[in-house]
Amino acid sequence: LFYLFAEHKDAECKSVEDKAALIEQLKSCPNSVVVLDYTLFDINDASELLVFAERYVNTKWLLFSEDLSIDFVRMVLASCPRFSVVLKECTLSEIRMAITATLSGQRYICQRTMEMMLVPEVKEEKVKLTQTETEILKDIALGMTTKEIADKRFSSFHTVNTHRKNIFRKLGVNNVHEATKY
């Protein structure tokens, strides 16, 4: 992403690790474009993200994630016109278009997200997690890291990470905080 932003001469890139650092950067540069992988950042839910958007009204947001729930996307896009969405699976040209549009103050929604949003909402049945997924979710709720869970289960980190992704997908959530409400 740094390379893609470097294509825009007026863009200066900085990276932050957590909410506190993001707040400091937004205080000093309120006209920023924030590229955010919501699923990996320490923002708890859509409401908290929207508070950031309300607080920093000149900031534009580009959500750049692997997997976002459709309910989350609908809520964010309906609540604030300064959010754009592009998925990590998108083509390089689509990611470039998202960056260019967001930098120029336009909203960009990638093709895959648009397709997801056009699918009518369906009343879902009770989510069925496998026994393994339920056990892993309990360990997550206890605050264990993916590595700790893998060690406990005598599994690889990648196996547990795949279970985590499946849990998030089945529950229709984007992060640990939302998943543990289940």
Residues covered by each model-derived region:
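Regulatory hinge/linker segments at domain boundaries
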Residues: M114-D139
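N-terminal regulatory/sensing modules of transcriptional regulators
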Residues: L1-M116
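Recognition helix of helix-turn-helix DNA-binding domains
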Residues: G143-E178
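Conserved catalytic core of two-component sensor histidine kinases
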Residues: E89, R96, T130, L137, ...
